[in-house]
Amino acid sequence: MPVADRPLASRGKYAEIVEKLSANFKEIPPQEMKGNELLRILEDTLSYVPSSTAKGEVCDISLFDHVKITAAVASSLLRYMQQHGIADYKNFCCTRGLENRKKDTLLFISADFSGIQKFIYRVQTKGAMRMLRGRSFYLAMVMEHIIDEILEKLSLSRANLIYSGGGHFYMMADN
């Protein structure tokens, strides 16, 4: 769960969160939004809300992360079923769920930009700090460009990007 200066949402804050979501959805209804636009609103609103409020459970996953992973799995499974001509989603997921879990329905895509440390730290001492920040920013932008290209080529949304940082990224897609 992200660490921030502001505390986790308390019971008194939930009405405020619902109001913020309602205000966003009055401007543009969710069914008219692009997936990435809806994802951004949910990230802004739910990143500091725990996914579980059950007593005795550790609140270590945000509601946003829970929703995002659920969307990645659901969209990947839907695409898999559509591409394999499976029309009875309930039968595939529920009735024959245990049997179908053994199938390779999901594909995890991983990338590692090796050698980035050499690139970042190969600087002269004069102005080194500015160069380090500049090179780090450049690599982050290159990585984001590559991620966006892959997502676009595979017709995936940002929900399918599970993690990116430190020269690595992981995505989920249909197999």
What are these regions (language model features)?
Residues 1-175:
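Regulatory and interdomain segments flanking nucleotide-handling catalytic cores
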